[in-house]
Amino acid sequence: MFEQRVNSDVLTVATVNSQDQVTQKPLRDSVKQALKNYFAQLNGQDVNDLYELVLAEVEQPLLDMVMQYTRGNQTRAAQMMGINRGTLRKKLKKYGMN
């Protein structure tokens, strides 16, 4: 089970193990581990558009959760994310979330 929490200005991922012990680590550590796993599975294959792949993996759930948090209020969501509302609308359309 994973849960995201804001701890100061750092997003963390809380993991609950089988003994109900909770451990927290920065989200960036989880991203780094996911990339290590991805590279290990490549077996020397070339990769194209890695930046877009990683960005899409993070951006889509970010948009989804922010839109849920703001109850669909795009102006408030854009403000929360620090982006222009037009940019938000473009990103929502890109992921079929409009």
From Swiss-Prot:
Domain of life: Bacteria
Molecular function terms from GO: DNA-binding transcription factor activity; sequence-specific DNA binding
InterPro entries, sorted: Fis_DNA-bd (IPR005412), Homeodomain-like_sf (IPR009057), HTH_Fis (IPR002197), Trans_regulatory_Fis (IPR050207)
Key word DNA-binding present: yes
Keywords, alphabetical: Activator, DNA-binding, Transcription, Transcription regulation
Residue ranges that the Swiss-Prot or TrEMBL entry lists as coiled coil: none
Pfam families xref list: HTH_8 (PF02954)
Residues annotated to bind DNA: 74-93
Family per similarity comment: Belongs to the transcriptional regulatory Fis family.
Subunit structure: Homodimer.
Its job: Activates ribosomal RNA transcription. Plays a direct role in upstream activation of rRNA promoters.
UniProt name for this protein: DNA-binding protein Fis
